[in-house]
UniProtKB/Swiss-Prot annotation:
Pfam families: Flu_PA (PF00603). Implicated in endonuclease cleavage of capped RNA primers. Displays an elongation factor activity in viral RNA synthesis. Dispensable for viral transcription, but not replication. InterPro entries: PA/PA-X. This is Polymerase acidic protein. The gene is PA. It comes from the Viruses. The keyword Phosphoprotein applies. Influenza RNA polymerase is composed of three subunits: PB1, PB2 and PA. Keywords: Phosphoprotein. Phosphorylated on serines and threonines by host kinases, including human casein kinase II. GO terms for molecular function: RNA binding.
């Protein structure tokens, strides 16, 4: 109950379609009672790596590095053995940073769900699984958004990036932590639009804006 052992993992699929979990290390976290957004929780991170710390020792001054054994790696000519190291250090993060981290993760999931819906709709129309063709067809374009020129289209890669960027910006602008900054950002967009329309904002407006932006 006094400590939590949190694995650092990622999940993917192999070329054969099997699910795979990759383990990169662990985080050891003690008890914490974070009340304010700026309260800090300390933890110890332990990361597996094949990077030899002796090559660039100045990079790892804050780490305790242990050689924990060897790892067999597959190469084009067969298997080779490489020493494995464990990089250990103390670190800390605040309550608000952890909250933002969770929200940014949800942004990725949200944009992936939208892509999944597009693939399902395309598969339903063609009456077959279109996942592979969806990503490999370089010539097909998809609607991204509207501009003064009309509907903008781009590759599926650009669609993915646009959806992710929209999710991130929506998350940021909806955050009460950034309410003041968001308000000043909107003013900046209005100033930029005024300059494009050859309507020069007065010096007092710009000076006041910069002062408010710095305080926000």
């Amino acid at each position: 109950d006094d400590f939590q052992l949190i694995p650092m993992i990622s999940k993917c699929r192999t070329k054969e379609g099997r699910r795979k979990t990759n383990l990169y290390g662990f985080i050891i976290k003690g008890r914490s009672h974070l009340r304010n957004d700026t309260d800090v929780v300390n933890f110890v991170s332990m990361e597996f790596s094949l990077t030899d710390p002796r090559l660039e020792p100045h990079k790892w001054e804050k780490y305790c590095v242990l050689e924990i054994g060897d790892m067999l790696l597959r190469t084009a000519v067969g298997q080779v053995s490489r020493p494995m190291f464990l990089y250990v250090r103390t670190n800390g993060t605040s309550k608000i940073k952890m909250k933002w981290g969770m929200e940014m993760r949800r942004c990725l999931l949200q944009s992936l769900q939208q892509i999944e819906s597009m693939i399902e709709a395309e598969s339903s129309v063609k009456e077959k699984d279109m996942t592979k063709e969806f990503f490999e067809n370089k010539s097909e374009t998809w609607p991204i958004g509207e501009s003064p020129k009309g509907v903008e289209e781009g590759s599926i890669g650009k669609v993915c990036r646009t959806l992710l960027a929209k999710s991130v910006f929506n998350s940021l602008y909806a955050s009460p932590q950034l309410e003041g900054f968001s308000a000043e950002s909107r003013k900046l967009l209005l100033i930029a639009q005024a300059l494009r329309d050859n309507l020069e904002p007065g010096p007092s407006i710009l000076e006041g804006y910069m002062k408010q932006l710095r305080s926000a």
